[in-house]
Every structure is written in C-alpha cells, then in structure tokens.
Swiss-Prot record:
Record GO terms (molecular function): DNA binding; zinc ion binding
Compartments in which it is found: Nucleus
UniProt zinc finger (C2H2-type) residues: 6-28, 34-56, 62-84, 90-112, 117-139
Native source species: Xenopus laevis (African clawed frog)
This protein's record includes keyword Transcription: yes
SMART domains in UniProt: ZnF_C2H2
Name of the protein in its database record: Gastrula zinc finger protein XlCGF29.1
Gene Ontology CC terms: nucleus
Keyword annotations of the record: DNA-binding, Metal-binding, Nucleus, Repeat, Transcription, Transcription regulation, Zinc, Zinc-finger
InterPro entries: C2H2-ZF_domain-containing (IPR050636), Znf_C2H2_sf (IPR036236), Znf_C2H2_type (IPR013087)
Reported function: May be involved in transcriptional regulation.
Membership in a protein family: Belongs to the krueppel C2H2-type zinc-finger protein family.
Chief localisation class: nucleus
Length: 139
C-alpha cells in the first residue's frame, strides 16, 4: 500500500499525492473551477469537464439498421441492438421489471440489494456515502 501522508483537515480522508488532496478539497469548498464553454456548467476536475463536453456532440453517426435510431457513440448503438434480439429478456427476480440486457438488469438489481445512505434534510438516498456527503453540501 502507498503511504497516504496527505490528510484532509475537513474529513480526515488521506491521499498518497498532494494533487489528489487539493482536488479533494474542492468537495468541501464547493468550488468548480472548470467551466463548460457550451453551457457554463462547472466541474471540480478537468476530467469531468471533458466527459461532459461529449454530451454536447451534435452528430449522431451510429445508425441502427433495424429501426433507424441514431447514436452519438458506438457503445450506445451496440447496447440498443440487443433490444432487437427476439426472446432475449432478463427479468428481475425481485420485481416485475424486464430488461433487454444483462448489464441493465445487474444495474437494476443494486436497487434491491445495496445499502443506501439517506439524506437527513430531504428524501434522497445514495448508494455511496461519498455521494451523500457531496449532496449534503447543497443544504
């Protein structure tokens, strides 16, 4: 394990790199120094901004040959193509929902099995404690 000698004074989370601590501190300050030039939305990390900018992509070059639906990304088309397979269904054993891919079912199953972290200020719940902490900063 790496030596985690950089500790946050707000929550005591430790990091092996000073740069990671500095990036982490933005969670506590609420600062979002990386802004989208398309819509103005702010992000704590440049990486998050880059991921967001892809949502503004206008061309949809990937076309389903079965129904004509278009996608910005090849993985979106590939996922969609599974919905055209006959008799390929993945039912949830906990409720009545049916999914066209095992990946979608697996994501859904987390709602039945994972521990949740409720916000004490509103009715939102989160699957990860870190997401609850981030959310609580808005209250």
């Amino acid at each position: 394990t790496k030596d985690k000698s950089f500790t946050c004074t707000e929550c005591e989370e430790s990091f092996s790199l000073k740069s990671r601590l500095i990036a982490h501190l933005l969670i506590h300050t609420g600062e979002k120094p990386f802004d989208s030039t398309k819509c103005g939305k702010g992000f704590r990390r440049n990486q998050y901004l880059k991921e967001h900018l892809s949502t503004h992509r206008e061309d949809r070059p990937f076309v389903c040959t079965v129904c004509g639906k278009t996608y910005k990304y090849k993985h979106g088309l590939n996922t969609h193509l599974h919905s055209h397979k006959v008799n390929t269904y993945f039912p949830c054993s906990e409720c009545r929902k049916i999914f066209s891919s095992k990946a979608s079912l697996d994501i859904h199953l987390r709602h039945h099995t994972e521990k949740t972290f409720p916000c004490t200020e509103c009715d939102k719940t989160f699957k990860q404690k870190k997401n609850l902490k981030r959310h609580q900063m808005i209250h």
